Amino acid sequence: MGTGSSREQHLNSFNTLQKETVPFSSDLWKTILSQNLEDDSLYLENLKKLKNERPENLATFIKKLVNQLVLVKGLQRETNTPGDFQLTSISLSYLSRILPIVFESGDDFADKVFWLNEGIEPLSHPSAKISTPPSITTTKTTEIIEEQEKKDQENKQVEENKENEEKKDEEKKDEEKKDEEKKDEDKKENKTTTTTTTTNTTNNTNNNNNSDESSFDTTPLAVKLMDSLLDLLFFPGFTVTESLGLKSPKEASPDAIPVLFSWAGGFGVDSVPTVHNKQFWINRLSVLQCLITCLSEQLYVPQDSVSTFKSKWLDWITHTQEYYTEALLFSLINTFATFDPIGWGIPYNHLMYSDDHEICSKLSIQILNVLLTYDPIENNDQQPQQQHHHHQQQHHQQQQQQQQSTIECRNKFIQYIKTLKRVRDFKFFFNAFERIMNVPLIASHTKLPNSTKKIELHQDLTYTMWLFLSYNHDFLRSIVNYENSPEFLIPLLQYMDEGRKSQTTHGIVQIGTFILLLLSGERDFSISLNKPFVGRIHIDIQQPQVYSDFVITVMYRLLVDTPDRLESIYECVLTILSNLSPYMKNLSMVTCVKLMKLFEYLSTPRFLFATNHNYRYVGFLLESLNNLLQHQYESNTRLIYAILRCQNQFSKLAYLKISPVTPSKPMEQITQPSPISTSEEAFGKLNKLSISEEPSTLSNEKSDKTTDGGDHQDESISKSKVQSKPTTEHPNSTGATPSSTNSGTPTIKAFSSTTPNQESPKLGGDGIDSQSSTPNKQQLPPPPPQQTKKTQMVSHFMPTDEWLQDIKKQLPLDNILKVITHLSPQIQGLCTGSGSDEQKIMDYLKMSTIVGIFHNPGPIMTRRYHSNAITKSWFIAYMWCIIYLENHSPPLFLHTNIKLFQVKQ
């Protein structure tokens, strides 16, 4: 009965706030702070009404809450009681709900209250002050508040006494100085007297200024709030052990807080005196929740301008303050790096006790990602100009690189990550990454059902790994040269393979392709993929022989065997394959057949003529095959055998022509080859293909049939299915649509324009840097399939024979045709003499050579990733989508006006 009545009075107090202007000294605030804030939609509605109807009361309430935090970490720092900490937790919970409501409005309320210290005037309705406080029930928290007010008065008296004593000490020192000056020589007496009088006058003016500043504090309320939150994260007795001392660490170390105040040891600090307990984790959680809401201003900014948006909150914590940077960075990293949900491997251990370390680990990763992502672009001319010539694009890239080199990053956290060089820290982070990434896979494939809790930190941690790899090249090198470096790809590629099945999980596919693109630019990483495959996979594919087989198999499934076509990653995935191909050895027959099926899929007229830029996909794949033939011919005889068996497809492309009568088929009718499971089936499929030196003529009837009748699957999508999907998104913008479930990954969408080769968002000269003469462009983020189809219907691209002959000159097909014409007669003669024995053919190919066939073997070309405004805005949207989806209890951002991405209710 008591709790129900107190809850009613609590709600009644909010109703009073919505009707009348309440002064700062009113007892009504005691009633509001006397009860914990429950996760109830009523409180959220009341806070929104308070913001809209009585903004002056909300501003007073915010000042009241911030003053409580300042009081706990300031005046009564050494005399806090458990009741004071309880009141602090209540204040933190209120602030974490109020800040998103303040940010979503987009008005000047936040600037006036938090940064300008201006008062909020009431709205048009008349204001009335409360004369008598409402009757409240006697609770523990109200008694705490009354005791706290008494303590405040006592503390003020103590401070006044200290100030009087300090003034007396200063007067004594001045008198001593005067006595010493009188003992000097008579010649200098006049000079010394003048200097003493001037110093006395300046001291008096300084004292007057200090008294004026003490009477009117000009520090922004946001700075007080952020400084209090950072102090509470390392507050002895609240979040760390009391053995560190209750006095402020700024007295002993004014430059930076000692790293011993970190929560855990491991990264950056070997050991810390703090021992974890449940209450520490609860207090840390409340502070972290309030901190992430302070940094959530980007959620309420449109994605078009988020890459250049400057947040005062993020500017202060990443640039202005330096005192807590190292300790905060170490604490956030070590919190999730030391998290081990499996532990000793006791089954069903998560049912015996609740682990608060898990929630803090998730928030720590998310706050770390927010801090490391904030680096607003200074100049606005970051969009790729695709209408310019190639030399103009190179000049534009050089200017951008010079500007990036001259403009230093202001973010202290990014600067610290870039300067890390300790190998021990790299190994510690990498081992934690491998362990946490494997937890969901282990939990989903245990012999005892639900014996291991499925901790899903892999999405946040994958993004953190991307940030570390992109910022610190030494860390990238250490990962590449690690003794078991390719093993961390096993969970990553499995998540990518699972993510392709649903549109809500395409985000993990995108971030995985970025990581692979970054790694593929390193020669040592490409060579390490030739190691024998040692690991356990849980997806429905054959056990790979080497890591290269595993990578190509997953890439094949991403491009071909996907319900919703991920056309935006086509060029990125094929670029990865092109970077890795010069170093791949001993590819299995299954992998070689998949490469041939992929070439068949991309080179069919139905796919090739769909848009005027699809030929580039064929060019990347042909470049990869050329690299394998030129640089790894002796170790890839299976690939040569597969090329000879599928030479008909290369001949078709070489002699392809377009007659004026030939219509272009819609993309919905493109057939996809199905995955091949065993090497025996691969040999069987290849044996069914005919070897012929004569080019086959093309017709529409033959192009509708595949070389292998039962090996392709139809991926046609009905028009009714396309029309049934909602298309309420704004075109020509990039948006993220989080699903309504907690486990789903947000879908990052972009939309093609009517001319994909000119206006569609691409990762072109600004995104992928290459040494080739032709700029390579990557379209990012992924367009939804229904919008791509609409674009094709609007653009009405009709290929001509002149266009076809022009693009065929750009395709590197000559070397493969030379190999076919050189080896095909020899293989035919061998088959007619002794029969078609695969083993004899393979032995013969091992003895063969292609010396003299390639006149000008091209150099190894590597394309690297470079950031631009489009990809940067996509990363920010993807990061905040994950944060939004995983913070539902308590609901920090639910039912607020999110502008960064679209929320489907």
Swiss-Prot record:
Pfam families: Dymeclin. The keyword Amino-acid biosynthesis does not apply. Residues 139-191 form a coiled coil. Residues 147-217, 381-404, 690-793 are annotated as: Disordered. Keywords: Coiled coil. Residues 192-210, 395-404 have a biased composition (Low complexity). Disulfide bonds: none annotated. Residues 147-191, 701-718 have a biased composition (Basic and acidic residues). Residues 690-700, 719-760 have a biased composition (Polar residues). One of its GO terms (cellular component) is Golgi trans cisterna. The keyword Nucleotide-binding does not apply. Belongs to the hid-1 family. This is Protein HID1. It comes from Dictyostelium discoideum. The gene is hid1.
